[in-house]
Regions:
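Transmembrane beta-barrel architecture of outer-membrane proteins
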Residues: 34-38, 81, 126, 181, ...
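Small/polar, glycine/serine/threonine/aspartate-rich low-complexity segments that form flexible
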Residues: 6-43, 166-176, 208, 221-259
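Bacterial Sec-pathway N-terminal export signals of envelope proteins
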Residues: 1-10, 16, 43-44, 58, ...
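Amphipathic alpha-helical coiled-coil segments
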Residues: 71-97, 105-107, 111-112, 148, ...
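Short, charged, amphipathic alpha-helical segments
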Residues: 58, 121-130, 261, 327-329
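Periplasmic alpha-helical coiled-coil/stalk elements that build and connect Gram-negative outer-membrane
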Residues: 74-187, 199, 288-291, 295, ...
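A glycine-/polar-enriched beta->alpha junction
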Residues: 1-4, 16, 38-56, 66-73, ...
């Protein structure tokens, strides 16, 4: 609602070709070259639409900020996934290489034991079959590592040695204590919900703006003008003009009413989209929380299984070396 100040000027050149009086005779021609300069100060007294537009623009900035946060989160997620997948591919390749070396030694050992008559040809074939399978898995792991490396470089940047990546299990964010806490935090900070809220607020302002188009507006202006060579009888003129303007666009062929109806329907649609986004968010948070808890339980179970498998493997290796257990067993 700040006033506006306008400076203007004009210069006219006259060239009268013919001028007659009432009796039909020629009249004297006195052309002038008027010069006008003016300064005008204008203040809007009543304009609801300007305030609504200002508030809508502020909401637009908040909406852009929420979209930026969402984009950042998407990039963070892709970066974390690329990082962990490359580590997984590297570890998988190391495991398959160790397994391949182990089975290679086992084939050599079984060949010697077969020559000594300690095992049968079936045992050797079983070892060779396992070795062939390990070779296929090793090649697949190498390809997975190459793909993971390319994905990492595409998202994060160049990396020369995948072994330089460190394994860290510490979360980069604080995990909520309960599911309800997680849902509550997501309702406040989830970018999708924030975007839906800001879009709803924008449509509300659009509806208010369309209604404001039917509300009267008022303005007040003060203009001072200076004129030289005004006419053949007037040389200079200085004039002050005070103007009050009231405008009320109460009818425009139904166009404004149609715009109001359109924005009202759009507001209802955005409100439904917000409700759907909130429900979808709660479902996703619940699913993510369940997956996290299941992963924790699964990890604990795997640790116990690995510990038991190590003990069992030591016994099996000892029996195998003594000859009391065959390769097929």
């Amino acid at each position: 609602y700040k006033p506006s100040l306008t400076l203007s000027g004009s210069k006219s050149f006259e060239d009268t070709n013919k001028l007659t009086n009432q009796s039909g005779g020629d009249a004297s021609i006195n052309d002038v070259e008027p010069l006008t300069k003016s300064i005008k100060l204008e203040q809007n007294l009543l304009d609801f639409n300007r305030g609504i537009t200002h508030k809508r623009n502020i909401i637009g900035l908040d909406l852009a900020s929420a979209k930026l946060i969402k984009k950042e989160q998407d990039i963070f997620y892709e970066a974390i996934e690329a990082y962990t997948q490359l580590i997984l591919a590297r570890e998988t390749l190391d495991i398959n290489k160790s397994n391949l070396d182990l089975l290679s030694r086992q084939v050599e050992n079984d060949q010697i034991r077969l020559d000594r008559g300690q095992i049968t040809i079936t045992d050797l074939s079983q070892s060779e079959s396992s070795f062939a399978g390990a070779q296929a898995q090793f090649i697949e792991a190498k390809n997975d590592l190459l793909i993971s490396k390319l994905t990492y470089e595409n998202i994060i940047g160049e990396i020369k040695d995948p072994n330089s990546l460190q394994k860290k299990s510490t979360a980069i964010v604080n995990i909520p204590e309960t599911l309800n806490d997680a849902i509550s935090i997501s309702k406040r900070k989830n970018p999708d919900i924030l975007i839906a809220k800001f879009e709803l607020d924008q449509t509300k302002k659009d509806l208010e703006s369309s209604k404001a188009d039917l509300i009267p507006t008022a303005s007040l202006s003060l203009e001072r003008s200076y004129s030289d060579d005004v006419s053949s009888t007037i040389d200079e003129r200085e004039k002050d003009t005070l103007t009050t303007t009231l405008s009320w666009p109460f009818y425009s062929g139904g166009k404004k009413r149609s715009t109001i109806s359109k924005n009202a329907n759009l507001t209802s649609r955005k409100r439904l989209l917000l409700d759907d986004t909130i429900q979808t968010n709660e479902t996703k948070v619940t699913s993510a929380w369940s997956s996290l808890e299941s992963s924790k339980s699964f990890l604990d179970s795997v640790k116990v299984q690995v510990k038991a498998a190590k003990i069992a493997n030591e016994g099996i290796v000892a029996e195998y070396e003594r000859g009391s257990r065959t390769t097929l067993d």
